[in-house]
């Protein structure tokens, strides 16, 4: 760094100082200017002047002052006619405390002694002179001299810096050493906060003593001797004692009892503990100067000084530092729960917060102290000939120092960040190259398992599976991301990590679980169920899309960097199942990616990620996700559910083109509510002036304006469950099993022996050809079995259904009612079967229509059900009904008559084979899948016990 660069960086901070120094020269008399120049050019010492006729050997009231000066290293100067008299004439300081000489600033021992005696009884003098509270070795006189020395020493040190800048040949190293020497003393003394007048005076005394001993900036202290140049900020910080250690413990704002949050508001005082005491201390100090100089210390003057100091103190400047210390404490507490899992990154983050807080606190305290002193001295200088140039000098010095500090600030932050980076890289080297931030995700997941182990262990019972595979996506972690940004390692972090944990019999498997979740290739393999017959694949959180991430750290401004994400995405997930009866729930797998435009905002463009499911053997239940799904059910009885949480939108199932059983095309709408979308987000971390922006993948719930349309392909799927919307099912030429779920659905079996369950809603069920089983469910349904020997199921609460039938030997079974609980009434061209409790009815309006008539589906029908069966197997026939009602316009078959007819049938021989087939259909339907539970529940349904005596054949 050359001098020109250094001067440019200091220009803004030094400008005020140079202007103030120039004003000081013009404001004083000619003698003052000459004396000031001589002081700058000379040794610039502080002297204690002793009257020429004072005899030290004989002793007197001044001996105490002389002894104190000797202890403090303040030179004694015996008055003579030459230098003292000329000084008095030139700057008009007759009978004043302070005066300039050719070799420095003189303090009149005589005048000081008089002032001490004059004000010895005042509270102010007692405060300034309470040496016992500071150091038992210092007398009151010693302490006051130390205070004066400290203030003037600070000013003289600033003049040294100014003279270096003006020389034009000073090196950057000299400037850095000068500024850092001042920083060192201010940080170690002032930044710990001022709690009393005595402490403030003591700190200034030490500061002045250290700087006043500096001669020509050649010997700047042992701590900075090895500083090679200004650019080596790391070493510079380490050389500054206490900057990065110790201060946070002593700094008042770090104390949780400082009440910063309660006492701070924009434009108001920080708190009495901090700024109040600083104000009191500096006010008392400058008032003492005025008293010592013989100036007024009235209440009005004191108020002016206090007001000036308060205006120089910014409460909000302290808040940033206070927040960092507070955050560090919170992060430290947060870090404890992850340390036992081998991750210390949160502690590193807290370490940075403390370091940054220390820097902010130190520099804020320095600038606050300098600004307050400058303001106080300026206020105290009112009415003082000597005070005015001194005040201007102090203002100039503080402006210059502030500029130097600001130029050094970024290097301080980077030193802390670089130290943390070194720790991270050292850890990776010690741990075989493992990624430090990935280790952070591992610790987060281990903590998640520990905290939620009880709930996770209950999944076996909840999902009714001997084995549960829980897949958890640890998403982007702000703390881990912030640490990566601070340490300039943002290109080494990932957006998260997916984990698979196996639970068997309520216990987590600690060893190998025979599960593979490869987020790079998009393969999830759970085909080895570890000998268990039932298992469930459960996603505890939304799973990000598969692929490979890379990042590149690019500079996009002087202090600005962006870690750009590049993602090679796999277009689908593949899930492999094995022999177990598995429950595969994909409702939390993210299947839509939302893209951003060049400005980082969502563009509205999306990409769909497919799910390929190879279910293997076993009876599997597959819950559809939020996007395209290709399912191969394999062997076994497999079911696909579109009913999870009510479903995502309307489902249209089409099996009309199937060439093999279980093959369907499902066109569905995804427009109900909000869906998971993978998005690119950004996190920005501030390190002083440097900003680090990290791009990462995350997910959000979004509701697209028009929704999505997608198409699923199902193969070897035996059963499909619809949504809460109005779904359409069209069966194949094979046996189909459809459940409408909620909504007003349309189910058509077409060919094959189909099972159609309407579920809730006003549904239309049409069996078509084949021996079908039709269950309308709740709602007012329209049901037509079509050709074949069909079975209709009715339950309590099903609503008022309309039933059509054509051809075949058909049966209507009341699963929960005896015939004695029913009544049959004649209608215009048909009959109405009513439940006596009013819970539902079945209207067969075309029972008596001829075959020339057509039903609503356009097919001819005789609309008669050959047998009506009660829950205990009692039955009546269509012929028995016709005998009682055919030739009547109105009429009723009572419950008693129905019971009598059923009793007569018990002694008759019936077709046991036909009845057994009907019985099997009903039992299988009720035992393997309860239509109520199937459409409403998200989980496997427990097998119902076979209904006793339902359709049981009578003894023959």
From Swiss-Prot:
User: Where are the residues of the annotated region Cholesterol recognition/amino acid consensus (CRAC) region 1?
Assistant: 48-58
> Which parts of the sequence are annotated with region: Cholesterol recognition/amino acid consensus (CRAC) region 2?
349-354
Q: What is the effect of changing residue 285 to F?
A: Does not affect cytolytic ability
Q: Provide the residue intervals of the Hemolysin-type calcium-binding repeats.
A: 613-639, 722-756, 757-791
Q: Where is the lipid attached (N6-myristoyl lysine)?
A: 558, 689
Q: What happens when the gene is disrupted?
A: Cells lacking RtxA display strongly reduced virulence.
Annotated effect of mutating residue 448 to F: Does not affect cytolytic ability
Return the annotated region ranges for Cholesterol recognition/amino acid consensus (CARC) region 3: 444-453
Q: Where in the cell is it found?
A: Secreted; Host cell membrane
Gene Ontology biological-process annotations: killing of cells of another organism
List the record's Gene Ontology CC terms alphabetically.
extracellular region; host cell membrane; host cell plasma membrane; membrane
Q: Where is this region: Cholesterol recognition/amino acid consensus (CARC) region 1?
A: 280-287
Asked if the Swiss-Prot or TrEMBL record annotates the protein with the keyword Cytoplasm, the reply is no
Using the chain's own numbering, where are the disulfide bonds? none
Repeat as a keyword of this entry, yes or no, is yes
Named from the GO MF annotations, one term is: pore-forming activity
Q: Which UniProt keywords apply?
A: Cytolysis, Host cell membrane, Host membrane, Lipoprotein, Membrane, Myristate, Repeat, Secreted, Toxin, Virulence
Membrane topology per record: Multi-pass membrane protein
Post-translational modification remark: Myristoylated by RtxC; the toxin only becomes active when modified. Mainly myristoylated; a very minor fraction is acylated with hydroxymyristoyl, lauroyl and palmitoleyl chains fatty acyl groups. Fatty acylation is involved in binding to host membranes and promotes the irreversible insertion of RtxA into the host cell membrane.
- Locate the region Cholesterol recognition/amino acid consensus (CARC) region 2: 340-348
Q: What does this protein do?
A: Bacterial cytolysin that attacks host cell membranes and causes cell rupture by forming a pore. Binds and permeabilizes target cells by forming cation-selective pores. Constitutes the key virulence cytotoxin of K.kingae. Binds cholesterol and oligosaccharides on the surface of host cells. Does not bind beta-2 integrin (ITGB2) on the host cell surface.
Family stated for the protein in its record: Belongs to the RTX prokaryotic toxin (TC 1.C.11) family.
State the protein's name: Cytolysin RtxA
Organism, by scientific name, is Kingella kingae
């Amino acid at each position: 760094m050359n001098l020109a660069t250094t001067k440019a960086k200091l220009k803004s901070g030094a400008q005020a100082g140079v202007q103030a120094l120039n004003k000081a020269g013009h404001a004083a008399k000619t003698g003052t200017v000459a004396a000031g120049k001589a002081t700058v050019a000379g040794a610039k010492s502080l002297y204690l002047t002793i009257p020429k006729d004072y005899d030290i050997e004989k002793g007197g009231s001044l001996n105490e002052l002389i002894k104190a000066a000797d202890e403090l290293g303040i030179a004694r100067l015996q008055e003579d006619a030459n230098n003292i008299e000329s000084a008095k004439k030139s700057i008009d300081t007759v009978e004043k405390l302070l005066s300039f000489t050719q070799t420095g600033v003189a303090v009149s021992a005589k005048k000081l002694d008089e002032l001490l005696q004059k004000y010895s009884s005042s509270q102010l003098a007692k405060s300034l002179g309470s040496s016992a509270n500071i150091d038992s070795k210092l007398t009151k006189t010693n302490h006051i001299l130390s205070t004066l020395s400290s203030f003037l020493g600070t000013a003289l040190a600033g003049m040294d810096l100014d003279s270096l800048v003006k020389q034009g040949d000073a090196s950057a190293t000299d400037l850095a050493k000068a500024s850092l020497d001042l920083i060192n003393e201010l940080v170690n003394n002032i930044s710990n906060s001022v709690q009393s007048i005595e402490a403030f005076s003591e700190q200034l005394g030490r500061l002045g003593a250290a700087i006043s001993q500096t001669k020509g900036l050649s010997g700047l202290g042992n701590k900075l001797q090895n500083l090679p140049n200004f650019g080596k900020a790391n070493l510079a910080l380490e050389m500054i004692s206490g900057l990065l250690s110790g201060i946070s413990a002593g700094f008042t704002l770090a104390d949780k009892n400082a009440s910063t949050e309660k006492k701070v508001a924009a434009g108001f005082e920080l708190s009495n503990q901090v700024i109040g005491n600083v104000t009191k201390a500096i006010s008392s100090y400058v008032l003492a100067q005025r008293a010592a100089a013989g100036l007024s210390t009235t209440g009005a003057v004191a108020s002016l000084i206090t007001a000036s100091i308060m205006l120089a103190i910014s409460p909000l400047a302290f808040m940033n530092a206070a927040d960092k210390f507070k955050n560090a404490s919170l992060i430290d507490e947060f870090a404890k729960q992850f340390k036992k899992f081998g991750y210390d990154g949160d502690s590193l983050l807290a370490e940075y917060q403390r370091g940054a807080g220390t820097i902010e606190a130190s520099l804020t305290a320095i600038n606050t102290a300098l600004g307050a002193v400058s303001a106080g001295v300026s206020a105290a200088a009112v009415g003082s000939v000597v005070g005015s140039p001194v005040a201007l000098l102090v203002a100039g010095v503080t402006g210059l120092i502030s500029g130097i500090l600001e130029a050094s600030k970024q290097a301080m932050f980077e030193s802390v960040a670089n130290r943390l980076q070194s720790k991270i890289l050292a850890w990776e080297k010690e741990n075989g190259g493992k990624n430090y931030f990935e280790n952070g995700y591992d610790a987060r997941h281990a903590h998640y398992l520990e905290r939620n182990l009880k709930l996770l262990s209950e999944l076996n019972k909840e999902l009714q599976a001997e084995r549960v595979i829980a897949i958890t996506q640890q998403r982007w972690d702000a703390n881990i991301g912030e640490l990566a940004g601070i340490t300039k390692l943002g290109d080494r972090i990932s957006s998260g990590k997916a984990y698979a944990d196996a639970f068997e019999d309520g216990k987590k498997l600690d060893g190998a679980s025979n599960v593979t979740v490869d987020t790079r290739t998009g393969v999830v393999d759970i085909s080895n169920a570890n000998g268990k017959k039932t298992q469930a694949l459960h996603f505890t959180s939304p799973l990000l899309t598969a692929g490979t991430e890379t990042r590149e750290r690019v500079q996009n401004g002087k202090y600005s960097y962006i870690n750009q994400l590049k993602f090679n995405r796999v277009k689908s997930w593949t899930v492999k199942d094995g022999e177990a009866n598995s429950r595969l729930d994909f409702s939390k797998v993210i299947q839509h990616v939302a893209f951003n435009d060049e400005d980082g905002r969502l563009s509205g463009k999306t990409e769909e990620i497919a799910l390929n499911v190879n279910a293997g053997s076993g009876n599997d239940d597959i819950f559809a996700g939020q996007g395209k799904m290709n399912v191969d059910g394999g062997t076994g009885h497999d079911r696909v559910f579109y009913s999870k949480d009510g479903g995502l939108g309307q489902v249209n199932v089409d099996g009309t083109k199937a060439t093999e059983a279980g093959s369907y095309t499902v066109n569905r709408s995804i427009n109900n509510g909000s869906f998971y979308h993978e998005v690119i987000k950004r996190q920005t971390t501030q390190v002083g002036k440097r900003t680090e922006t990290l791009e990462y993948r995350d997910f959000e719930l979004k509701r697209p304006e028009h929704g999505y349309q997608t198409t699923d392909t199902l193969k070897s799927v035996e059963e499909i469950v619809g949504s809460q919307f109005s779904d359409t099912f069209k069966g194949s030429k094979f046996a189909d099993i459809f459940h409408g779920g909620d909504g007003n659905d349309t189910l058509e079996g077409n060919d094959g022996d189909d099972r159609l369950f309407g579920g809730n809603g006003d549904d239309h069920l049409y069996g078509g050809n084949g021996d079908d089983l039709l269950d309308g469910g709740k709602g007012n349904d329209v049901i037509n079995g079509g050709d074949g020997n069909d079975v209709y199921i009715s339950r309590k609460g099903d609503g008022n259904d309309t039933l059509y039938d054509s051809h075949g030997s058909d049966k209507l079974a009341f699963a929960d009612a005896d015939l004695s609980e029913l009544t049959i009434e004649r209608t215009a061209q048909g009959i109405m079967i009513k439940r006596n409790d009013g819970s539902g009815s079945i209207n067969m309006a075309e029972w008596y229509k001829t075959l020339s008539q057509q039903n609503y589906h356009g097919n001819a029908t005789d609309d008669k059900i050959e047998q009506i069966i009660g829950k205990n197997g009692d039955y009546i026939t269509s012929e028995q009904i016709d005998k009682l009602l055919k030739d009547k316009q109105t009429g009723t078959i009572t419950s008693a008559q129905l019971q009598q007819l059923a009793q007569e049938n018990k002694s008759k021989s019936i077709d046991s084979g036909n009845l057994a087939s009907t019985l099997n259909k009903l039992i299988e339907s009720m035992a393997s899948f309860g239509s109520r539970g199937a459409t409403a529940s998200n989980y496997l349904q427990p097998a119902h016990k076979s209904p006793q005596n339902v359709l049981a054949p009578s003894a023959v």
